[in-house]
Amino acid sequence: MPKRDAPWRLTAGTAKISRTGNNSRALIMGPSTSRASAWVNRPMYRKPRIYRMYRTPDVPKGCEGPCKVQSFEQRHDVSHVGKVICISDVTRGNGITHRVGKRFCVKSVYILGKIWMDENIKLKNHTNSVMFWLVRDRRPYGTPMDFGQVFNMYDNEPSTATVKNDLRDRYQVMHRFYAKVTGGQYASNEQALVRRFWKVNNHVVYNHQEAGKYENHTENALLLYMACTHASNPVYATLKIRVYFYDSIMN
């Protein structure tokens, strides 16, 4: 006895659909986003007013583009008594690494590199921490003050360094961090990577001189102090410091 045909065989114009095909909603409806991602990526006009009023601008107030960059690449010998470098030294000129006039704003600072020990020092069993301070000098004059002249320490220990009371109105610690290296035969860590990015928005003012030197600053010089905690074993810091700045419209 022959089997009866299925109803779809008797219906004219009905096409068979393979059951092996992937008929998921993603292929039919296209790529869909979740409600959470749609809420996070909503347009600015749908967000509260505080997001529109207090949004950080790309260009600092009172400045104009383009964004310029100045790099400081050097190997530093970091000792227990400390060291200081000026990272707001920008020469006057017309290039992408020069300032146009006396005033400019350092928007951000990018520090990357490593802390490492010498071949003879890394064999000794010790732990050495390198401390860094990003300091703003509001009234620069002459040459940068040494680490011991700016910071007050207990028992000459850099890890307890704080700005002296009579210099607090002039020197302001904006950021600080440290990196640690360990020497020895077994559990040694002879180098440590350094990578920091900060937004500072520091408005620097120069005098009429064109050279980018600390002695030509008149307001808000940026200084980077560094010191190690071990008294007899110094370390080396190979750093690349990039300063991103904008020229002021008051030039």
UniProtKB/Swiss-Prot annotation:
InterPro entries: Gem_coat_AR1 (IPR000650), GV_A/BR1_coat (IPR000263), Viral_coat (IPR029053)
Short sequence motif named Nuclear export signal, residue ranges: 96-117
Subcellular location: Virion; Host nucleus
One Gene Ontology cellular component annotation held by this UniProt entry: T=1 icosahedral viral capsid
Presence of keyword ATP-binding: no
Similarity-based family: Belongs to the geminiviridae capsid protein family.
Protein's UniProt name: Capsid protein
Record organism: Pepper huasteco yellow vein virus
